[in-house]
C-alpha cells in the first residue's frame, strides 16, 4: 500500500481554470503583448504551468515537509555531519531588519553595526583556532579548503618554490583531494595504520621537496584524535611543507585544544556544523579560513579592519570599521561582496551565547555522548579502532553481514522505521561496512538509550523484515542504479509536453 501512495506533483494536481487569486476588471487601457515583443521572443503556445488554488499549493508543500526527517523532528546521528539542534533564537536575531535588509552596495557608514559584528567574529575565529589571520569570504567548507590552498600556492610562488603536491589522508573527506586538484596541485594519499591514525612511515615516504601541504583532519573521520600530531608536525615542517587542518570536526575540541597550537598553518571552519549555521537546503553557507601570520597577507579579501577615531565623543563612535584588502599580495576575491553574512551572524550569536567556557562544555558533552553510545554499541557491532573516541565513532557491520546477511545499508534503512535518521554508512572508506555515528552534544541520555535499543533490536530481527525495510516511509528502497543512469528530471504530460 505504501508504494501506491506516491505524492502527486503540482502538475498532476492541476485543474484547468483553477486560480489562487482572481483579478478585478481591467481599469486601464489594455495592451496587446504581441505588439510589445518581437515574434522570436514569444512562445507559440502557453507554458503548461499548473493551475491551482493557494490552499492546494500550501497543502502540497506542507505535506512534503512532513515526509522529511530533520533535526527539529528526529534524532539525526549522521556521522561526520554534526547534526546538532540549533537554537531558534539565533534564527530570530539573524532575521532582524538591521541584518536582513542591508544591501551589499550600501556605503560603509551605513553598515557600521554589521561590520563591528564581523570584526569581532574574525577575532573569535582567530582565538578559537590559534591562527591570527582570518578571512570569512568563502561560501562553504570546501570553498574554504580551496581558498586556503590558493593562499598556500601564493606563498610558495612568492618563495620561488615549485612545490606542487598535496598529501591527503585516506580517511579524509572527499573534498580534500578535490580542492587540491582545483587549486592546481597534484595529490597523493597517505595511508592509515592499524589504529586508524596516520601511518608515519607512509607519510615519511611521501614527503619530499615537491610537497606543499599535508591536509589533515584531527580528530579524523574515524572519530580519533591523532596522538602522533607532534611528530606529524615536525615531519611536515622539517620537509618545508605546510599543515592544513580540515576543521570539519572542530565540534570535538572547542576550548580544549587549538589547531594552531598543535601545528596547523591553515584551516577552515564549517559554521553549519559547529556554529549553528543551517544544514542543507543548498546553502547559503560559509567556510571561514584562518592562517598563521606569515600567510595572512595572501588571504582573500575583503576583511574587516578597525580604526580608532581621534575625535570620538564616547564608546559609541570610538571606532570606525572598514572593508579592506589584506594586502597587495592577496589572492583576491573568492566571493562577491563580503561573504554570506547571514550565516556569519548566526555564528557570532552562537559564540557570544556560549563564551569560552561554554564552548568547552559543548565539546565535552559531544565527546561524552559519543563515548556513551560506543560503550553500548560495541557489544553487538564490531568497533575496529578501540573503546574510546572523540565526537563520533565508526562501527562495522562486516560480521553481521557474514553471519546474518545484515549490511550497513540494511541497518540504515531499518532504523528509519524506529523513528531515527540513519547514521552515515560506507564512509570512511577505510572501514568495511562502516556505520558512522555522531550524536552531538544536544541529545539526552534517553534519546541515546532509545537509539541503542533500536540498533540492537535490528541485529536480532529476521532477514526478510530487514531487507524490505523501511516499512513506514512513503518510498522504501528506490532503484539507485536506474535513478542514476536514467533520471527523470522534468515533468511530461500525457501528450509529451514538458514544463521546461
From Swiss-Prot:
GO terms for cellular component: cytosol; glycine cleavage complex. Its EC number is 1.4.4.2. The modification N6-(pyridoxal phosphate)lysine is found at residue 273. Keywords: Oxidoreductase, Pyridoxal phosphate. GO terms for molecular function: glycine binding; glycine dehydrogenase (decarboxylating) activity; pyridoxal phosphate binding. It comes from the Bacteria. Its cofactor is pyridoxal 5'-phosphate. Pfam families: Aminotran_5 (PF00266), GcvP2_C (PF21478). The keyword Oxidoreductase applies. SUPFAM superfamilies: PLP-dependent transferases. Belongs to the GcvP family. C-terminal subunit subfamily. The glycine cleavage system catalyzes the degradation of glycine. The P protein binds the alpha-amino group of glycine through its pyridoxal phosphate cofactor; CO(2) is released and the remaining methylamine moiety is then transferred to the lipoamide cofactor of the H protein. This is Probable glycine dehydrogenase (decarboxylating) subunit 2.
Amino acid at each position: 500500500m505504501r508504494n501506491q501512495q506516491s505524492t502527486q506533483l503540482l502538475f498532476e494536481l492541476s485543474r484547468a481554470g483553477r486560480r489562487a487569486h482572481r483579478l478585478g476588471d481591467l481599469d486601464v487601457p489594455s495592451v496587446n503583448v504581441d505588439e510589445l515583443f518581437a515574434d522570436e521572443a514569444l512562445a507559440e503556445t502557453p507554458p503548461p504551468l499548473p493551475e491551482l488554488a493557494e490552499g492546494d499549493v500550501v497543502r502540497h508543500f506542507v505535506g512534503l515537509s512532513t515526509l522529511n526527517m530533520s533535526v527539529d523532528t528526529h534524532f539525526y546521528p549522521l556521522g561526520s555531519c554534526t547534526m546538532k539542534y540549533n537554537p531558534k533564537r539565533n534564527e530570530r536575531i539573524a532575521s532582524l531588519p538591521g541584518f536582513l535588509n542591508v544591501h551589499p552596495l550600501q556605503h560603509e557608514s551605513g553598515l557600521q553595526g554589521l561590520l563591528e559584528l564581523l570584526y569581532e567574529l574574525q577575532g573569535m575565529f582567530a582565538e578559537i583556532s590559534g591562527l591570527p589571520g582570518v578571512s570569512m569570504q568563502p561560501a562553504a567548507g570546501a570553498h574554504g579548503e580551496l581558498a586556503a590552498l590558493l593562499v598556500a600556492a601564493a606563498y610558495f610562488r612568492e618563495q620561488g618554490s615549485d612545490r606542487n603536491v598535496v598529501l591527503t589522508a585516506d580517511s579524509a573527506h572527499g573534498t580534500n583531494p578535490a580542492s587540491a586538484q582545483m587549486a592546481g596541485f597534484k595529490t597523493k594519499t597517505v595511508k592509515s595504520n592499524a589504529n586508524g591514525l596516520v601511518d608515519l612511515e607512509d607519510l615519511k615516504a611521501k614527503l619530499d621537496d615537491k610537497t606543499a601541504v599535508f591536509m589533515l583532519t584531527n580528530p579524523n573521520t574515524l572519530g580519533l584524535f591523532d596522538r602522533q600530531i607532534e611528530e606529524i608536525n615536525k615531519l611536515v615542517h622539517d620537509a618545508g611543507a605546510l599543515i592544513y587542518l580540515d576543521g570539519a570536526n572542530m565540534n570535538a575540541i572547542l576550548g580544549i585544544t587549538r589547531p594552531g597550537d598543535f601545528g596547523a598553518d591553515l584551516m577552515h571552519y564549517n559554521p553549519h556544523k559547529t556554529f549553528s549555521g543551517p544544514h542543507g537546503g543548498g546553502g547559503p553557507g560559509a567556510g571561514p579560513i584562518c592562517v598563521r601570520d606569515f600567510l595572512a597577507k595572501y588571504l582573500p579579501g575583503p576583511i574587516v579592519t578597525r580604526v580608532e577615531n581621534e575625535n570620538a565623543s564616547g564608546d559609541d563612535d570610538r571606532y570606525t570599521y572598514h572593508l579592506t584588502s589584506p594586502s597587495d599580495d592577496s589572492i583576491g576575491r573568492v566571493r562577491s561582496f563580503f561573504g554570506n553574512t547571514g550565516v556569519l551572524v548566526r555564528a557570532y550569536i552562537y559564540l557570544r551565547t556560549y563564551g569560552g567556557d561554554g564552548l568547552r562544555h559543548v565539546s565535552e558533552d559531544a565527546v561524552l555522548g559519543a563515548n556513551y553510545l560506543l560503550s553500548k554499541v560495541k557489544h553487538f557491532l564490531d568497533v575496529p579502532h578501540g573503546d574510546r573516541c572523540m565526537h563520533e565513532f565508526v562501527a562495522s557491520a562486516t560480521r553481521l553481514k557474514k553471519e546474518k546477511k545484515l549490511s550497513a545499508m540494511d541497518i540504515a534503512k531499518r532504523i528509519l522505521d524506529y523513528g531515527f535518521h540513519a547514521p552515515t554508512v560506507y564512509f570512511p572508506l577505510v572501514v568495511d561496512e562502516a556505520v558512522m555515528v555522531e550524536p552531538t552534544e544536544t541529545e539526552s541520555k534517553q534519546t541515546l538509550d532509545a537509539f541503542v535499543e533500536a540498533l540492537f533490536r535490528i541485529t536480532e530481527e529476521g532477514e526478510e523484515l530487514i531487507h524490505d525495510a523501511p516499512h513506514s516511509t512513503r518510498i522504501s528502497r528506490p532503484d539507485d542504479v536506474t535513478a542514476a543512469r536514467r533520471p527523470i528530471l522534468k515533468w511530461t504530460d500525457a501528450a509529451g509536453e514538458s514544463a521546461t
